[in-house]
Amino acid sequence: MNRSVTRRDFVWSCLGATAAAAGITGLAPSKARAVEAYRRTGSPRFLLSLAAYSFRDFFTDGNRGRKTAPDPARQIDMFKFVDFCADHGCHGAEVTSYYFPENFTGDYLLKLKRHAFLRGIEISGTAVGNTFTLPKGKKRDEQTASVKKWIDHAQLLGAPHIRVFAGTASGMTKEDAKKLCIEALEECGDYAGTKGVFLGIENHGGIVSEADDLLEIIRTVKSPWIGVNLDTGNFHTKDPYSDIAKCAPFAVNVQFKVEMQSQGQPKQEADLPRIMKILKDSNYQGYFALEYEASKDPWTEVPIWLKRMREAM
């Protein structure tokens, strides 16, 4: 007889570990049962990736409201971005949705997939801009529909992961906003599961600006295809490294920022060895993507940081 399994148990069993599930017909766990962190077998493994967001000011497509066009000599499109990843020793490329051509087709995605394969690059994921805390109605439906559309795009690209946002508690209590977010995550997570795509909710301010709130949502969502997209630069608490450590066991993707800013303190360079130790201690296995957001020229700085990350891995 089949019994309910937690989403972590489900994923664990899919990875070949000895999970407690007898089948996958009862994926939804009881809300009273806290979900455990991912229990990965084997040793920590890191696959170097680069987020297209790192070159946000230079994409020909995207940011269509930008006041000034990028320098023609330094413009880049998604194909050239994949080439950059290949030329700088990356395993993967995170193709942020903002920088795709307007009204692109499935044929465009297939050409990009083919190009990446021939350059020896995996599409490690994509990232969307969404708000899951809108009240029920047309605008909320548009948000979930957009995420589902990108789930379809990710499947076609062969991308295993999409970064999603939670949202803010605008005009409502934080608890009400969390409930709305959880409902949207479960709806989209169910759909993502039919396509074999993970959704990683990012610690991106709003109702998930602190680790405990993010983990409350993660533990409540009843989908084995939902995890944390851990952005190492997005906690601005008194001890952001502690917050990273709390969330690392739930991570399905990690985005490394070269700067961090604790509460009440100026920005400072991230302690890469310390972050690597946290990830290794949590037995993280997966993509480790540079998302360069600092003020210096990414064309100069990104290669330097990719080299440092590779050495730390």
Regions found by a protein language model. Give the residues of each.
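N-terminal pre-domain/capping segments
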Residues: 2-156, 176, 183, 223, ...
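Short loop/turn motifs enriched for small/polar and acidic residues
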Residues: 53, 167, 231
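A structural motif
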Residues: 90, 154, 159, 251, ...
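Acidic/histidine-rich catalytic cores of soluble enzymes
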Residues: 92-93, 182-278
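Glycine-/small-residue-rich active-site loops that bind phosphorylated ligands and cofactors
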Residues: 100-101, 169, 206, 235, ...
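A short helix->loop->beta-strand "cap" motif at the edges of active sites that frequently abuts
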Residues: 121, 197, 282-286
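Active-site groove signature of glycoside hydrolases
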Residues: 154-174, 195-204
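Short acidic/histidine-rich active-site segments
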Residues: 289-292
